[in-house]
Swiss-Prot record:
The keyword Hydrolase applies. Its EC number is 3.6.1.41. One of its GO terms (molecular function) is bis(5'-nucleosyl)-tetraphosphatase (symmetrical) activity. Belongs to the Ap4A hydrolase family. This is Bis(5'-nucleosyl)-tetraphosphatase, symmetrical. Hydrolyzes diadenosine 5',5'''-P1,P4-tetraphosphate to yield ADP.
């Protein structure tokens, strides 16, 4: 079995298929792990979701911020962003089925035999793996309830939940988990999430901010952390235990696949 980890696809389905052809991906024996943001800025979000759903157990997906935003759009809680290309998906006859499939996907996946942890944006450095899995499970539980739109999705859009504390409870605790696992890039020196700066670290000159993966971590280096979300990194973290896979395919760059067993990076340039 080969394990392939792919960066943010964002509806770039054709590029994904070309990438999988390069490695002769075989869903009968291989697994495709996706760091989230399956949908949005590319033009083939519907095909992307249908493909991952069709893979069944051969696909291991975590939710990204754009995937969660799709739930809000489907629930009529938000209006589509002009840069998104989601009309085909939102009007598809199987949209309810696809949304329900997304709701079953977690915020974190682990591959214990290889000491791998995968989330969309990263792992808060103050969380160990037990806290990470517990907090993510609480969000997954809320997503799978009948009232998920009013109880969670409608209330997740805030930047107030920026600081972790074990004393957080209810929606505030869920918000922090969503923000940390799907939106995190830089942290303030006291550990607070920063939601504004999207630059690469080399272009960010504030002494008050550092990339989340430069803080002392309770999950690395004993584990390898796989994430996407931060396209400006272009795959560069300076840490072999922190693997960044978003390389901006939807922005005209390329889609990146990591073959775990060979420790090999394979890329596919954006077609359009």
């Amino acid at each position: 079995m080969a394990h392939y980890f792919v960066g943010d696809i964002q509806g770039c389905y054709s590029e994904l298929q070309l990438l999988l052809q390069k490695v002769a991906f075989n869903p009968s024996k291989d697994q495709l792990w996706a760091v989230g943001d399956l949908v949005a800025r590319g033009t083939e979000s519907l095909a992307t979701l249908r493909f991952f759903q069709s893979l069944q157990d051969s696909a291991k997906v975590v939710l990204g911020n754009h995937d969660l935003h799709l739930l809000a759009l489907h629930g009529k809680l938000k209006r589509p962003h002009p840069q998104d290309h989601l009309d085909e998906l939102l009007n598809a006859p199987d949209i309810d089925n696809l949304v329900n499939w997304l709701r079953q996907q977690p915020l974190v996946r682990t591959l214990p035999e290889h000491n791998i942890i995968m989330t969309h944006a990263g792992v808060p450095p103050q969380w160990d793996i037990a806290i990470l899995e517990h907090e993510a499970e609480q969000v997954s539980f809320a997503l799978q309830q009948d009232d998920y739109l009013s109880a969670l999705i409608a209330q997740m859009y805030t930047e107030d939940a920026e600081h972790w504390s074990p004393s957080l409870h209810g929606i505030d605790r869920l918000r922090y988990c969503i923000n940390a696992l799907t939106r995190m890039r830089f942290l303030h020196l006291d550990g607070r999430l920063d939601f504004k700066c999207k630059l690469p670290p080399s272009e960010q000159h504030s002494t008050e901010l550092r990339p989340w993966f430069e803080f002392a971590s309770k999950t690395a280096p004993q584990n390898t952390l796989i994430f996407g979300h931060w396209a400006a990194l272009m795959g560069q973290t300076g840490n072999p235990h922190v693997v960044a896979l978003d390389t901006g395919c939807c922005w005209g760059e390329h889609l990146t696949l990591w073959h775990l067993e060979k420790n090999e990076i394979i890329t596919q340039k954006r077609l359009i």
